[in-house]
């Protein structure tokens, strides 16, 4: 089947980029599903739309049909990553990202002085780079499914680079009980199997170690108001969006003690800005330039209203800090 390297054209009913549609919730098994949103690839590298379903019983949101391994690889290529970074930079500046990483690291300084730390979904290693200011004696390693983690190693932002997912066969066994802290910042939504990723995270943690998970909140009111223009829906790359209650229950079932649940500080003030940027993404460059003042207005509203949003159901993310049990 002939394809373009950028925009594959599917000429049969079989789509190699998607698995068969499932009729039950991957989290609780319920068959009471509702399509929450249908959204196109914002970069238009592929035709069609991607659907996100929500379970009426447990609230888990998930891509359905889900990307296949081939589809996941396509949407994590370096070429796609660079173009996505350009779109994201219109919503959240690199300086804002650096400030956010520093603030997050500062808030985790209560973890004292861990010897070793694995940042999962590290990308270019920007969080470890920022965290070294507050944890100067900690060894930071990075894990990511893309080649960005190898660049982070070359540029000295991580001490070891691991390519893949925690649940990649052999990964957890190789890193067994090596780390005092494992962080998964906006990584779990990209994982094909979030539960397997959590189990693997606990495998690489030492007894008594800390697991920090931050995920977009599918119950955020912006998700309802903005629909497919709510950035954390993240189609086609976001595969799962578990609500806080589900993730907390899963970690407790795995024997963890929940130390912190936080909806306030993980909120990122970009919902309105991102909605405008996604609306303008398919427009010609001249129209995007002419409409740039709209982005400025939206950004101002996001930041002015952030103190209110982060204290209400408009908060767009949550964080859980859990401690692994000391004995098996």
Positions of PLM-derived features:
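Conserved SAM-binding loop
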Residues: 14-17, 21-22, 100-226, 239-253, ...
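Residue-level "edge-of-site" marker
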Residues: 68, 165-166, 264
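A C-terminal cap/extension of S-adenosyl-L-methionine-dependent methyltransferases
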Residues: 9-23, 38-46, 263-328
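Conserved SAM-binding loop and adjacent beta-strand
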Residues: 87-103
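A SAM-dependent methyltransferase catalytic signature shared across enzymes that methylate proteins
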Residues: 26-34, 247-263
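Short glycine/proline- and charge-enriched loop/turn segments
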Residues: 79-88, 226-235, 275-285
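Positions that flank functional sites
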Residues: 70, 220, 266-267
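N-terminal juxtadomain amphipathic helix
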Residues: 3-88
């Amino acid at each position: 089947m002939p394809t373009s390297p950028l925009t594959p054209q599917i000429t049969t009913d079989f789509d190699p980029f998607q698995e068969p549609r499932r009729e039950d919730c991957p989290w609780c098994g319920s068959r009471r599903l509702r399509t929450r949103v249908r959204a196109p690839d914002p970069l238009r590298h592929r035709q069609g739309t991607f659907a996100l379903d929500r379970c009426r019983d447990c609230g888990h949101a998930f891509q359905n049909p889900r990307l296949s391994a081939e589809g996941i690889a396509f949407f994590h290529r370096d070429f796609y990553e660079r173009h996505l970074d350009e779109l994201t930079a219109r919503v959240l500046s690199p300086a804002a990202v650096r400030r956010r990483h520093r603030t997050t690291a500062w808030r985790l300084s209560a973890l004292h002085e861990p010897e070793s730390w694995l940042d999962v979904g590290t990308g270019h290693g920007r969080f470890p780079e920022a965290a070294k200011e507050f944890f100067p004696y900690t060894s930071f390693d990075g894990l990511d499914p893309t080649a960005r983690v190898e660049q982070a190693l070359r540029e000295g932002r991580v001490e070891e680079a691991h390519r893949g997912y925690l649940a990649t066969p052999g990964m957890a066994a190789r890193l067994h009980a090596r780390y005092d802290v494992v962080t998964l910042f906006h990584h779990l939504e990209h994982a094909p199997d979030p539960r397997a990723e959590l189990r693997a995270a606990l495998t690489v943690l030492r007894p008594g170690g800390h697991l920090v998970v931050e995920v977009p909140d599918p119950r955020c009111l912006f998700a309802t108001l903005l629909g497919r223009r709510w950035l954390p829906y993240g189609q086609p790359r976001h595969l799962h969006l578990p609500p806080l209650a589900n993730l907390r229950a899963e970690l407790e079932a795995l024997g963890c003690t929940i130390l912190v649940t936080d909806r306030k500080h993980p909120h990122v003030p970009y919902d309105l800005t991102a909605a405008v940027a996604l609306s303008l993404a398919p427009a010609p460059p001249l129209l995007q330039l002419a409409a740039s003042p709209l982005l400025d207005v939206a950004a101002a509203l996001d930041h002015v209203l952030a103190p209110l949003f982060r204290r209400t159901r408009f908060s767009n993310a949550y964080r859980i800090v859990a401690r692994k049990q000391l004995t098996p």
